[in-house]
């Protein structure tokens, strides 16, 4: 009897929760249950009447002597017909529960599939209604035009010292970024630009391609090809830089074990004020010259913002790089492990990718770098600077000390139109200002204007000796470079940016080979360049 009550109650609950789940055939079941319930109630009334009659009759009889009572017989088994019907009702209830579950899954999937498309600042994005799935187009286009004002002295130097004026597509990137099932993210970005190396278009190479797990926030796990953070200057995205290129000291560190397309496994901590990252890196995806084991390195960074309010932000960044195993140059067990450091003079229009300062060692045990940087913004002003230290330990050399180099930079900007630079928590770095009013002559809007400046120095000399003198034992004549840059950035809207910059480059270096041995092969010149950028 209780079982029938429970079955009836469960059936009623399911019918109330999901009325659409019951078909016309279920109405007959409900009618039969109602009839059975009425029969049970009638039987209960009759049993009650019999009990009352027996009680009255027992009151007039003498009390019987106590006798041993036999064990009660087991309850009679329900008739086969009733048992069959109960089993059928059980099956119907199970079917209704399963049907209700399927309908709930279908409802949830229908909600998920109701995707929403949007365009924000030129970026097309499609996302599911619950936000667990998304896909967004990403793109960066940078077209550079530059002129090197060198004169006859540069053309008289050894091959490679004369920079070629002209133009190139510094970056031409197109990618897809999004997430799946809420906690997983991905980013695939292909670059068809020259990267500043040849000045010509490329068939395309991986700039970033990684998978990321975000379900343990604020911790993030990332694996694939991407540039790990090697410092504050490095963490500015390519489209958010103050000037056309990063500082030379920062770029040296970036290229040691970071940079675009770097194979890496990285653990990040991303908080409002605190940022941390630790990455194990290998070669770049596009590097194909090494025949055997590739480079292995550790890259780490920690950044903290002790002051954050509506007017101020102060950030301090400490980072380090350890290339503990440089890559082999051939497939033999005794293969040398070469390592080099070089950087163009903070503008990449030259087709030959000429470097005025560089260091190259044929066989290296390890190479390392660390840097301390800091930046502060006050409303529409930014001031930033950093110091960098580098070292190389030669392999198989016990009589000479390791080689040491350094560099530093200071830079700043003033947004003339009053906007402030933004902040990227994901990168712990500043972003471009967004114009209050987009450029529109008909509406009197002119976008945002930013004045920027930088001074950087990079010293790749170590016990270099003097001009006219022989190179001391263990000395390195990598050269010293000093660059002063001023620029004007115009932001017509959040997608477009135009940068006009002028530079004074001063490089001093003592030659080591041939006719230039022990002679000064440095040079001083000016550059002027323009970048047109679209980024979304």
Q: Could you describe each region identified by the protein language model?
A:
Residues 17, 21, 148-149, 394:
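N-terminal low-complexity, intrinsically disordered patches enriched in charged
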Residues 119-326, 376, 404-409, 414-444, ...:
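Outer membrane beta-barrel
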Residues 22-140, 416, 420-438, 444, ...:
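N-terminal periplasmic/intermembrane-space "pro-region" immediately following the signal or transit peptide
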Residues 212, 314, 320, 330-536:
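Outer-membrane beta-barrel pore domains
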Residues 1-22:
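Gram-negative bacterial Sec-dependent N-terminal signal peptides
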Residues 116, 256-257, 363-364:
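Short, solvent-exposed secondary-structure boundary motifs
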Residues 110, 162-164, 362:
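Short, surface-exposed alpha-helical recognition segments that flank or form part
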């Amino acid at each position: 009897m209780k079982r029938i009550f429970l079955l009836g109650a469960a059936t009623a609950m399911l019918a109330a929760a999901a009325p659409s789940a019951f078909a016309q055939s279920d109405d007959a079941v409900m009618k039969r249950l109602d009839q059975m319930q009425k029969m049970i109630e009638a039987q209960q009334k009759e049993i009650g009447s019999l009990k009352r009659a027996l009680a009255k009759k027992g009151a007039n009889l003498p009390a019987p002597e106590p006798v041993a009572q036999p064990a009660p017989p087991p309850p009679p088994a329900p008739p086969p017909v009733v048992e069959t019907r109960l089993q059928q009702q059980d099956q119907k209830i199970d079917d209704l529960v399963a049907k209700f579950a399927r309908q709930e899954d279908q409802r949830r999937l229908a909600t998920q599939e109701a995707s929403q498309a949007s365009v924000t600042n030129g970026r097309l994005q499609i996302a599911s209604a619950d936000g667990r799935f998304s896909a967004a187009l990403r793109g960066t286009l940078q077209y550079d035009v530059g002129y090197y004002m060198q004169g006859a002295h540069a053309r008289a130097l050894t091959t490679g010292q004369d920079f070629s004026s002209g133009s190139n597509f510094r970056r031409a990137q197109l990618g897809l970024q999004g997430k799946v099932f809420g906690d997983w993210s991905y980013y695939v970005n292909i670059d068809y630009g020259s990267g500043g190396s040849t000045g010509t278009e490329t068939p395309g190479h991986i700039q970033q391609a990684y998978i990321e797990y975000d379900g343990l926030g604020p911790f993030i796990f990332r694996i694939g090809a991407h540039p790990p953070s090697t410092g504050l200057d490095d963490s500015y995205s390519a489209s958010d830089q103050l000037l056309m290129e990063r500082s030379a000291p920062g770029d040296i560190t970036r290229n040691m074990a970071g940079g675009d397309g770097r194979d890496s496994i990285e653990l990040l901590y991303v908080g409002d004020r605190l940022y941390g990252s630790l990455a194990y890196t290998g070669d770049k995806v596009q590097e194909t010259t090494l025949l055997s084991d590739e480079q292995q390195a550790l890259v780490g960074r920690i950044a903290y913002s002790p002051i954050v309010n509506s007017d101020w932000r102060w950030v301090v960044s400490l980072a380090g790089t350890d290339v503990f195993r440089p890559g082999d140059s051939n497939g033999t067990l005794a293969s040398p492990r070469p390592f080099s450091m070089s950087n163009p003079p903070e503008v990449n229009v030259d087709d030959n990718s000429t470097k005025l300062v560089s260091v190259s060692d044929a066989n290296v045990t390890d190479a390392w770098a660390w840097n301390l940087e800091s930046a502060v913004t006050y409303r529409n002003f930014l001031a930033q600077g950093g110091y960098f230290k580098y070292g190389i330990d030669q392999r198989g050399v016990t009589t000479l000390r390791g080689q040491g180099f350094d560099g530093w930079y200071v830079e700043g900007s003033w947004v003339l139109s009053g906007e402030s630079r933004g902040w990227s928590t994901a990168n712990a770095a500043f972003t471009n200002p967004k114009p209050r009013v987009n450029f529109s002559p008909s509406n009197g809007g002119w976008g945002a204007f930013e004045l920027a400046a930088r001074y950087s120095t990079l010293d790749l000399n170590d016990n270099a000796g003097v001009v006219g003198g022989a190179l001391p034992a263990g000395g390195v004549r990598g050269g010293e470079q000093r660059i002063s840059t001023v620029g004007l950035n115009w932001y017509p809207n959040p997608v477009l940016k135009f940068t006009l910059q002028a530079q004074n480059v001063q490089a001093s270096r003592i030659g080591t080979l041939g006719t230039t041995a022990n002679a000064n092969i440095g040079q001083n010149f000016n550059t002027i360049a323009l970048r047109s950028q679209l980024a979304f």
